[in-house]
Structures are given as C-alpha cells and as structure tokens.
From Swiss-Prot:
It comes from Pyrobaculum calidifontis (strain DSM 21063 / JCM 11548 / VA1). The keyword DNA-binding does not apply. Pathway: Cofactor biosynthesis; riboflavin biosynthesis; riboflavin from 2-hydroxy-3-oxobutyl phosphate and 5-amino-6-(D-ribitylamino)uracil: step 1/2. GO terms for cellular component: riboflavin synthase complex. (2S)-2-hydroxy-3-oxobutyl phosphate binds at A72, T73, R115. The keyword Transferase applies. This is 6,7-dimethyl-8-ribityllumazine synthase. It is an enzyme of class 2 (transferase). It catalyses: (2S)-2-hydroxy-3-oxobutyl phosphate + 5-amino-6-(D-ribitylamino)uracil = 6,7-dimethyl-8-(1-D-ribityl)lumazine + phosphate + 2 H2O + H(+). The gene is ribH. Catalyzes the formation of 6,7-dimethyl-8-ribityllumazine by condensation of 5-amino-6-(D-ribitylamino)uracil with 3,4-dihydroxy-2-butanone 4-phosphate. This is the penultimate step in the biosynthesis of riboflavin. Pfam families: DMRL_synthase.
Length: 150
C-alpha cells in the first residue's frame, strides 16, 4: 500500500479545503493510505515542509495542494513559479515523488473552483503511480529482454 502525505495551503482555503476532500477520497479509492496532512499558510510555504516529509519512512510520496489566484499584479506568477521550481528540486533531491496539485497561476476564483477535483485527483494519482513504479523499478532486473515498468 502506498503511503501518502498531503500538504495543503490555507490561503484560498475555500478552494483548497475542497481539494483536500477530493484528494482524500481519491487516495482511498486508489487504495493508498494518507499518513499525514500538513497545512501551511500559503503555496509559497509548501516547500518548507516537503523535505521533512520526504525523510519520513512512513511516506512514499507527497501531494501538494494549493490555489494561486490571479491578482492585479504579477505576484501570483512569482509565487506559483517559485513554488513549482522548488517542489521539483526537492522531489529530485529526496528521490521521492512530490506531485504538483496547485491551481494557477493566471486562474481566477471561478476557474479555480472548476478545477478543484481535476487537480486534486491528478496529483494523488500521479503520486500513487510514481511511488508504485519506483518500487517496481528498484526491484526490476534486466534479463535479456526489455523491462517495462507501468
């Protein structure tokens, strides 16, 4: 069974709370166990807890959930781009899947609400698939014919 940690931004919590509910439902549907749910103030703060979660033995993958709503300035672009870059850096550094379930940048509140289920489900599904496939890859051995991990 894949063990997941979920990191949820509290900013725009009317949206991210719904994302959390959908993510928990989809994890259960896929047969994954959610071992941690960590709430952080905003999307920009998500990377602050990722390394700690990735080091835990009872976490196979981490799902990030957040919503960056377009404002009057370019602030949403900076937040979303920097968070996404650091999330990927930490995934590569830790060797554990950390998936991006962050709506935005450029989305307005209505668009974000329309994308809640899609983004939450995709992030959970990617985390579960990556965790399972990494385990299969670790156990796989080449024996003269192509090894396919799917």
């Amino acid at each position: 069974m894949v063990k997941l940690a979920l990191v949820v931004a509290e900013f725009n919590y009317d949206i991210t709370h719904l994302m959390l509910q959908k993510a928990l439902e989809h994890a259960k549907f896929l047969g994954a166990e959610v071992t941690y749910v960590v709430k952080v103030p905003g999307v920009f703060d998500i990377p602050m807890v990722l390394k700690e979660l990735a080091l835990k033995e009872d976490v196979d993958a981490v799902v990030t959930l957040g919503a960056v709503i377009q404002g009057a300035t370019k602030h949403d672009e900076i937040v979303a781009q920097q968070a996404a870059r650091k999330i990927l850096d930490l995934a590569v550094e830790s060797g554990k899947p950390i998936t991006l379930g962050i709506i935005g940048h450029g989305a307005n509140r209505m668009q974000a609400l329309e994308r809640v289920e899609e983004y939450a489900r995709r992030a959970v599904e990617a985390a579960v698939k990556l965790a399972r496939r990494k385990k299969l890859l670790k156990e796989a051995k080449y024996g003269g014919s192509t090894v396919v991990i799917d």
